[in-house]
């Protein structure tokens, strides 16, 4: 009996595209942080595709899992996965990353579908995640 591989060819290709998209968005913007989005591409892909319960058609669904990116400067990790999962994010948002017409440099609640909370200062996401978890207990 052979074990099913952790990553399929499609997974590997999608992770490679995620890394390229992160590098291209930062290069086009002329600023940003490509390292974390590139290094976390595989982990983020597996989380969004295999572990997290969420619905791109209903980002505010109460039964969803919450993803809080505490290191907001690595926002492309989240934006790319939201895009690939089918959330209402245009590819053009990546080409105008960190500009008024594109995706924000840090996750901003209400600006990007699927972003649970605004993060920017390092560590702020931890407090936000605890608050979201406490609130979820009462839903």
Predicted regions and their residues:
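Cofactor-binding active-site loop characterized by glycine-rich and histidine/acidic residues
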Residues: 39-139
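N-terminal capping segment at the start of a domain
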Residues: 17-31
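Conserved, non-catalytic sequence blocks in retroelement Pol enzymes and Pol-derived host proteins
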Residues: 9, 32, 119-122
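Basic/polar N-terminal segments that are highly enriched at the extreme N-terminus
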Residues: 1-12
């Amino acid at each position: 009996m052979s074990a099913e591989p952790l990553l399929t060819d499609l997974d590997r290709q999608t992770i490679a595209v995620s890394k390229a998209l992160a590098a291209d968005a930062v290069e086009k913007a002329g600023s940003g942080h490509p390292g974390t989005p590139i290094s976390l591409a595989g982990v983020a892909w597996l989380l969004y595709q295999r572990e997290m319960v969420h619905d791109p058609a209903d980002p505010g669904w109460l039964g969803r899992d919450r993803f809080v990116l505490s290191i907001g400067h690595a926002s492309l990790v989240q934006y790319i996965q939201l895009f690939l999962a089918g959330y209402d994010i245009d590819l053009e948002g990546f080409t105008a990353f960190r500009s008024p017409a594109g995706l924000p440099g840090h996750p901003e609640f209400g600006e990007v579908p699927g972003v649970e909370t605004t993060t920017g200062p390092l560590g702020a996401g931890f407090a936000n995640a605890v608050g979201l978890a406490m609130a979820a207990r009462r839903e």
